[in-house]
């Protein structure tokens, strides 16, 4: 069987177009455009690329995009002070602080300082807790983007055995909660997991997020499985590959995401959706 390719680039563009139409309708109705503040500390080249793509996406859909590029020498106190100012700014619906932060700044303290209603990355413990309790508000972008891909391809997830490889706070853990909401029987594997192959071979839906090129061989994939590859790894020759050996896995899977052009574009598209949601649901004047 040759797998159908899940085209994240096309779906992400659809999502962004839908958001752009809603923003145009808001502005036409006399409401303000949503505002996103993107904070970058230091000059990490990968972070600069990510931030540029987020700012570009913002402007394309008609958001007000505010950029805060702070020097590497910025102190934790200065960064927290900026977040306090942005929390109090009624024209800003989302605050995004690009990770990783320089040494000496506590990521957890910074992410927890962002007001949960402006936490468009979905990392605040309040938002993660809401997802745990089956009452989500702003949801972590990559897991939510993956669920959107599955929905747009009309893949019925109820009753599937889902296996998540990797237990990070950004992808693996929140992904497991999204999969529970999507009706899956969910297993999360990590570096202490014994006999990883056994888990992979029994997965109807496999989500791999470890950041190691070719970590999952294609012959481990169950015939007809759905494979979602979150990894983005640049090889020495400049080629970008995922965590799964794509060519071999595509011979066995029913659906597979490519790298690049699979999950990556959905992360930014979901960030855009979250910012609109924050604006409409939490920051618009409510009818009394």
From Swiss-Prot:
<keyword id="KW-0511">Multifunctional enzyme</keyword>
<dbReference type="GO" id="GO:0004488">
    <property type="term" value="F:methylenetetrahydrofolate dehydrogenase (NADP+) activity"/>
</dbReference>
<dbReference type="InterPro" id="IPR020630">
    <property type="entry name" value="THF_DH/CycHdrlase_cat_dom"/>
</dbReference>
<comment type="pathway">
    <text>One-carbon metabolism; tetrahydrofolate interconversion.</text>
</comment>
<feature type="binding site">
    <location>
        <position position="232"/>
    </location>
    <ligand>
        <name>NADP(+)</name>
    </ligand>
</feature>
<comment type="subunit">
    <text>Homodimer.</text>
</comment>
<keyword id="KW-0554">One-carbon metabolism</keyword>
<dbReference type="InterPro" id="IPR036291">
    <property type="entry name" value="NAD(P)-bd_dom_sf"/>
</dbReference>
<dbReference type="GO" id="GO:0035999">
    <property type="term" value="P:tetrahydrofolate interconversion"/>
</dbReference>
<dbReference type="GO" id="GO:0006164">
    <property type="term" value="P:purine nucleotide biosynthetic process"/>
</dbReference>
<comment type="similarity">
    <text>Belongs to the tetrahydrofolate dehydrogenase/cyclohydrolase family.</text>
</comment>
<dbReference type="InterPro" id="IPR046346">
    <property type="entry name" value="Aminoacid_DH-like_N_sf"/>
</dbReference>
<feature type="binding site">
    <location>
        <begin position="166"/>
        <end position="168"/>
    </location>
    <ligand>
        <name>NADP(+)</name>
    </ligand>
</feature>
<keyword id="KW-0560">Oxidoreductase</keyword>
<dbReference type="GO" id="GO:0009086">
    <property type="term" value="P:methionine biosynthetic process"/>
</dbReference>
<keyword id="KW-0028">Amino-acid biosynthesis</keyword>
<dbReference type="InterPro" id="IPR020631">
    <property type="entry name" value="THF_DH/CycHdrlase_NAD-bd_dom"/>
</dbReference>
<dbReference type="GO" id="GO:0000105">
    <property type="term" value="P:L-histidine biosynthetic process"/>
</dbReference>
<protein>
    <recommendedName>
        <fullName>Bifunctional protein FolD</fullName>
        <ecNumber>1.5.1.5</ecNumber>
        <ecNumber>3.5.4.9</ecNumber>
    </recommendedName>
</protein>
<comment type="function">
    <text>Catalyzes the oxidation of 5,10-methylenetetrahydrofolate to 5,10-methenyltetrahydrofolate and then the hydrolysis of 5,10-methenyltetrahydrofolate to 10-formyltetrahydrofolate.</text>
</comment>
<dbReference type="InterPro" id="IPR000672">
    <property type="entry name" value="THF_DH/CycHdrlase"/>
</dbReference>
<keyword id="KW-0658">Purine biosynthesis</keyword>
<dbReference type="GO" id="GO:0005829">
    <property type="term" value="C:cytosol"/>
</dbReference>
<keyword id="KW-0378">Hydrolase</keyword>
<keyword id="KW-0368">Histidine biosynthesis</keyword>
<keyword id="KW-0521">NADP</keyword>
<dbReference type="InterPro" id="IPR020867">
    <property type="entry name" value="THF_DH/CycHdrlase_CS"/>
</dbReference>
<dbReference type="GO" id="GO:0004477">
    <property type="term" value="F:methenyltetrahydrofolate cyclohydrolase activity"/>
</dbReference>
<keyword id="KW-0486">Methionine biosynthesis</keyword>
<dbReference type="Pfam" id="PF02882">
    <property type="entry name" value="THF_DHG_CYH_C"/>
</dbReference>
<dbReference type="Pfam" id="PF00763">
    <property type="entry name" value="THF_DHG_CYH"/>
</dbReference>
């Amino acid at each position: 069987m040759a797998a159908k390719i899940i085209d994240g680039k096309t779906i992400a563009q659809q999502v962004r177009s839908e958001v752009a139409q809603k923003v145009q309708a808001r502005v036409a109705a006399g409401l303000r455009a949503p505002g996103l503040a993107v904070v970058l500390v230091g000059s990490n080249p990968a972070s600069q690329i990510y931030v540029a793509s987020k700012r570009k996406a913002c402007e394309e859909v008609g958001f007000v995009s505010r950029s805060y590029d702070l020097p590497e020498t910025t102190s934790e106190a200065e960064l927290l002070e900026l977040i306090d100012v942005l929390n109090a700014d009624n024209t800003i619906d989302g605050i995004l602080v690009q990770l990783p932060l320089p040494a000496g700044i506590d990521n957890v303290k910074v992410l927890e300082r962002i007001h949960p209603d402006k936490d468009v990355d979905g990392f605040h413990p309040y938002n993660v807790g809401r997802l745990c309790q089956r009452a989500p508000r702003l949801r972590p972008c990559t897991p939510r983007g993956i669920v959107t891909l599955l929905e747009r391809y009309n893949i019925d997830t109820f009753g599937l055995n889902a296996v998540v490889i990797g237990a990070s706070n950004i992808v693996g853990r929140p992904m497991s909660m999204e999969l529970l909401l999507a009706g899956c029987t969910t297993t999360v594997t990590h570096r202490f997991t014994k006999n990883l192959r056994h888990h992979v071979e029994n997965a109807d839906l496999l989500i791999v997020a470890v950041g190691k090129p070719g970590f999952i061989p294609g012959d481990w994939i169950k015939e007809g499985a759905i494979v979602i590859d979150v990894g983005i790894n640049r090889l020495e020759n400049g080629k970008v590959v995922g965590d799964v050996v794509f060519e071999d896995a595509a011979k066995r899977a029913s659906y597979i995401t490519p790298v690049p052009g699979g999950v990556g574009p959905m992360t930014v598209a979901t960030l855009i959706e979250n910012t609109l949601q924050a604006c409409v649901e939490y920051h618009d004047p409510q009818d009394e």
